[in-house]
Structures are given as structure tokens and as C-alpha cells.
Curated annotation (Swiss-Prot):
This is Elongation factor P--(R)-beta-lysine ligase. GO terms for biological process: lysyl-tRNA aminoacylation. GO terms for cellular component: cytosol. It holds the Pfam family tRNA-synt_2. The gene is epmA. ATP binds at residues 100-102, 109, 242-243, 298. HAMAP family: EF_P_modif_A. It comes from the Bacteria. Belongs to the class-II aminoacyl-tRNA synthetase family. EpmA subfamily.
Length: 323
């Protein structure tokens, strides 16, 4: 009766065995360095304000409550982990499932495994070095090359991303077939050109860390004290994949509140629903999250490189198509 059902795993048993071995090796990497492994909730009262993230939500119906409660599936354990940092956890890491209500395909699955860790008293460069250590251990690859966002953008796009006029960015985006480019804001143009022109050209032979993204793309990173045009944010690229996104973390509660509010302003302009601001994170920041750097790394993409897989479902027991 059920012979035609697609019941078999997405990944081969061989790949699942290799996956388990690599995840165990990742855990050893961090425990050997004295980091505490933590677990935080998958469900939360608060979603995220970031306009670039689409979230899943559900409803908690309690027989003892007067009304149901909306809950959000985690897109990242970041906010909860920062609350632990404020409580005095020290350096921490986590391997967990996260959820993003976005595309599914060769490089994306709505549910995937995230490795996230935080290092009190590390600056951005020291954390880049630790990511490099991890990649060399897991992938046996060449050392990471660190390049500034400004440098790689000028190298491949031919414009200075920090000073180019919007008209120049529009003209360049049109060369790469962005429809109605003149209607997009400056950051959207930068992001389009970076993903379309820069990303395919970096990280082919060795991992590349791109640092000092424009301040307008700071997300939850600090603005550089040496150059206010850039943020202390970095990303890792290797073998055609964006692997990780890291920050010298923003710890100023007032600035964080302002950024959340600006996210909701942008959401309104884009016709997106506004999101409730996570007051518990703000409470932790006010209490004192230590100066730290943190990073989120896509484990499934790391496994794709390690195992030579062409699609993300080849390293997952079950991808979204047969979950």
C-alpha cells in the first residue's frame, strides 16, 4: 500500500556516520578549549526584527491559560546565549537546530543545524583565528585569507562600497540584470553586487574571511572605533558557500534598542509585519553582557564541503522534501 512513499533518508548511511563523527570532533574542539556547551529554547515569546529573516511561528494552547500564546521558532540561539553571558556563563558554544521560513534548495533547508559560540574578551580578529583553527582541523584545508569588504568589492565590482554614489551602484547592478535597480536602496544594491559578483570569486582554494562590512549592515555588531563607516562584522566563504557570520558583539543596550526600532520602521516601509522587540535580551544587555565576539556557522554546509556533497540534503537524514 505504501511502497511508493518516499520513506528513505536523504543522506546515505555512510554520510550519516561521517556526520556523527565530525559533530563529535567539533564538540571536542570546543571542550578541549574550555568552552561550556549549552542548550537554549527552540520556542520563544519573541521573534526577530531583522527584515532579512522570515520566521516560523506556532501557538501554545494551555488548558490553564485564559488565552493562547504565540511562540516563534528560533532562527538563532543568539539572544538566549547572550542572556547566559550576562549571567556569567563564560565562553559558551551550542549545536542546535534553527528554523528559517525561506527557500529550500541545493544550499538551503528551512530546518538546519547551527554551531554558535561566544568568546568574552575576544576581538573580531582573534575569533577569526579560532574559526580558522576549526576549519583547518575539520576540513584539513589551507589557512584562511582575511580580506576587507572594501578591498574585495573594489577588486571584483570596481567601485568603492563606502564612497560610491547610488547612481554608480544602480548602473553597475543593471549590468548584472537587477530589475528596477533604481528603486532599490543603497544597501540592497551593495548586497546584490556582493552576492552576485564578489561571492562567486572568493574562497575557491582556501577559506576567506571578509571583515569590516559597511556600518549600515552592522546587524548586531559594533561599529568600528577606527572607521565609523564600517562595522566589526565578518563572514567566512569557502568552496562557493557562505559558511559563517560573526560579530564583535554590540553590548550597548540603547544602541541595540535603536536598531530594533529601525528594523521595525524598515519592516513597515517594506510592507512586512512588525515584530515585538525582545525585552529580555535588552534586560541582559542593561545588566551587562561582557565585551565579546561571537559567530554562527552552518554545520550542514560545513559537512557539504567535508563530504564533497553537491546538495544540503545529502548530509541530512531527511531534507524538507521528505521530512
Amino acid at each position: 500500500m505504501f511502497e511508493q512513499e518516499n520513506w528513505q533518508p536523504s543522506a546515505s548511511i555512510e554520510n550519516l556516520l561521517a556526520r556523527a563523527k565530525i559533530i563529535a570532533e567539533i564538540r571536542r574542539f570546543f571542550t578541549d578549549r574550555g568552552l561550556l556547551e549549552v542548550e537554549t529554547p527552540v520556542l520563544s515569546e519573541f521573534g526577530v526584527t531583522d527584515v532579512h529573516l522570515s520566521t516560523f511561528n506556532t501557538t501554545f494552547i494551555s488548558p490553564t491559560a485564559e488565552k493562547s500564546k504565540a511562540l516563534w521558532l528560533s532562527t538563532s540561539p543568539e539572544y538566549h546565549m547572550k542572556r547566559l553571558l550576562a549571567a556569567g556563563s563564560g565562553p559558551i558554544f551550542q549545536l542546535c537546530h534553527v528554523f528559517r521560513n525561506e527557500e529550500a534548495g541545493q544550499r538551503h533547508n528551512p530546518e538546519f543545524t547551527m554551531l554558535e559560540w561566544y568568546r568574552p574578551h575576544f576581538d573580531m580578529y582573534r575569533l577569526i583565528n579560532e574559526v580558522d583553527d576549526l576549519l583547518q582541523q575539520i576540513l584539513d584545508c589551507k589557512p584562511t585569507e582575511s580580506l576587507s569588504y572594501q578591498f574585495v568589492f573594489q577588486e571584483y565590482v570596481g567601485l568603492d562600497p563606502l564612497s560610491a554614489e547610488k547612481a554608480e551602484l544602480v548602473a553597475k547592478a543593471k549590468q548584472y540584470h537587477l530589475q528596477q535597480a533604481e528603486q532599490e536602496d543603497r544597501d540592497t544594491l551593495l548586497q546584490f553586487l556582493f552576492s552576485t559578483v564578489v561571492e562567486p570569486n572568493i574562497g575557491k582554494e582556501n577559506p576567506v574571511a571578509v571583515y569590516h562590512f559597511p556600518a549600515t549592515q552592522a546587524a548586531l555588531a559594533q561599529i568600528s572605533s577606527e572607521d565609523h563607516r564600517v562595522a566589526e562584522r565578518f563572514e567566512f566563504y569557502y568552496k562557493g558557500l557562505e559558511l559563517a557570520n560573526g560579530f564583535h558583539e554590540l553590548t550597548d543596550v540603547n544602541e541595540q534598542l535603536h536598531r530594533f526600532e529601525q528594523d521595525n520602521v524598515q519592516r513597515q516601509k517594506m510592507g512586512l509585519p512588525q515584530r515585538q522587540i525582545d525585552k529580555r535580551l535588552l534586560g541582559a544587555l542593561q545588566a551587562g553582557v561582557p565585551n565579546c565576539s561571537g559567530i554562527a556557522l552552518g554545520v550542514d554546509r560545513l559537512l557539504m564541503i567535508a563530504l564533497g556533497a553537491n546538495a544540503i540534503h545529502e548530509v541530512m537524514a531527511f531534507g524538507i522534501e521528505n521530512a
